[in-house]
Amino acid sequence: MAGNSIGQVFRVTTFGESHGAALGCIVDGVPPGMALSEADLQHDLDRRRPGASRYTTARREADRVRILSGVFEGVTTGTSIGLLIENTDQRSQDYSAIKDLFRPGHADYSYEQKYGLRDYRGGGRSSARETAMRVAAGAIAKKYLQQQHGIVIRACLSRMGDIVCRQYDWAQVEQNPFFCPDAQQLEALDALMRDLKKCGDSIGAEVTVMATGVPPGLGDPVFDRLDADLAHALMSINAVKGVEIGDGFAVVGQRGSEHRDEISPSGFLSNHAGGILGGISSGQPLLARLALKPTSSIMVPGQTITRAGEATTIVTHGRHDPCVGIRAVPIAEAMMALVLMDHLLRQRAQCADVACTVPRW
């Protein structure tokens, strides 16, 4: 009931709070015999970590991960892998002035209603700080998927506010602090971020995540559809308010003659479905987009109430991201990797002996 785990065969359980001593997770279901080191996980953690650029939160965490178990002599043993990241740059005093206030748009009010109390320091368990462990676990899945099955997962910032990326150059994504695939938009993004910092406000974003090399057959009927599990995983990311698979909400304006992905002897002629048909992967690239709200931790005064129900005004003075969509890029990759890893192992467990003569491309 606690909601701290995801996956069935490849299962990840996280723990920790924003201003607690440490963050950690247990990863079950990792196949034995895969070479694994802390360096394999650190690359994606460095992409996500706070303070990595002037466009993200000023909180500076090294996010150095430690592997506590499940790896012997540099190789996975098949047993539970324990991971730990210590928090080192907490400034809980930044939140002392608002400990009895509810930040509008945050989980403060709903957590208080659910538990009767809350950790007001940076949001506690509801903070996006928790996603560091998802990225660490996702790095394990990404390595296995790529090495064993040739599956490559990548994401990018496809929109920030009114700035929309028109060109998708994946080589460009890792060359700028926005994870933006369109070099022509970098100047506009920089100007927007400087304006947001100047006025103490924030902005929403869209992140696109894609997986190539996904084999057909992943996913189960009805409640365990691949797209259902993927949407669940992506919606669990902090600040995500919407998820699209394939053409998503654009299908409302399409006709069946346009939307259906016709098939030829050489393969599919389009990919409006985003690589999933009937909840099961088709072998085409998996494509999803997620919409992230603007963070509510801003310097602009807003109305709220105290725990006693009295009206008051609030200003959040902590260190926060003007656009959470930037650091959501490696998180989206991690969540897609966790879902694909779990479904791949489930498919192997049930259908490893299935032989299909229908062409695949």
Curated annotation (Swiss-Prot):
One of its GO terms (cellular component) is cytosol. Its cofactor is FMNH2. Reduced FMN (FMNH(2)). SUPFAM superfamilies: Chorismate synthase, AroC. CDD domains: Chorismate_synthase (cd07304). Its EC number is 4.2.3.5. It comes from the Bacteria. Pathway: Metabolic intermediate biosynthesis; chorismate biosynthesis; chorismate from D-erythrose 4-phosphate and phosphoenolpyruvate: step 7/7. GO terms for molecular function: chorismate synthase activity; FMN binding. Belongs to the chorismate synthase family. This is Chorismate synthase. It comes from Edwardsiella ictaluri (strain 93-146). The lineage of its organism: Bacteria, Pseudomonadati, Pseudomonadota, Gammaproteobacteria, Enterobacterales.
